[in-house]
């Protein structure tokens, strides 16, 4: 499968202010909305052929995450596809670590324990995070210095 690992350069990409936790959580929420939609519509549980234990839906959801994160100007470290980001800078100030479909085997079995997990790391420090259960809709968020919340 073709994947959009070539991110736009930072000069070309629209950006989200990484210091604005509300804007980052809004982006993460939109990503989780998209991954939920993809999983709900999925009927292809075939292997991706890219890695052992990776399903085609893992790749599809990863691609959606990369598109949205790169579009916001972020470098990404994905559990599914590894590093991608503007200018091949492997030491960016801001990096989003993502597991696009954590629990994909649970998802194949129809079990309600699968999630998209995202975390913004700024200058090596985790600052904003979201974990969204893709079957139940429950979302957990955390902001450095602001605590953690469930569905709020």
Each predicted region: which residue ranges?
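N-terminal subdomain of lithium-sensitive/metallo-dependent phosphomonoesterases centered on the IMPase/IPPase/PAP
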Residues: 1-98
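Surface-exposed, flexible loop/turn segments at secondary-structure boundaries
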Residues: 82-84, 137, 147
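Short, intrinsically disordered, charge-balanced linker/junction segments flanking boundaries
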Residues: 149-152
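DPxDG-like acidic metal-binding loop motif
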Residues: 90-145
């Amino acid at each position: 499968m073709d994947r959009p690992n070539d991110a736009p350069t930072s000069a070309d990409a629209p950006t989200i202010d990484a210091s604005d936790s509300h804007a980052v959580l809004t982006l993460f929420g939109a990503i989780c909305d998209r991954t939920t939609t993809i999983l709900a519509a999925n009927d292809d549980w075939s292997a991706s052929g890219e890695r052992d234990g990776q399903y085609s839906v893992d790749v599809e959801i990863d691609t959606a995450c990369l598109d949205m994160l790169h579009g916001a100007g972020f470098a990404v470290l994905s559990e599914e596809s590894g590093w991608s980001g503007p200018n091949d800078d492997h030491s960016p100030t801001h990096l989003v670590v993502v597991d696009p479909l954590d629990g994909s085997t649970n998802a194949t079995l129809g079990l309600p324990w699968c999630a998209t997990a995202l975390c913004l790391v700024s200058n090596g420090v985790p600052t904003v995070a979201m974990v969204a259960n893709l079957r139940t809709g429950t979302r957990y968020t955390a902001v450095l210095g602001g605590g953690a919340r469930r569905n709020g």
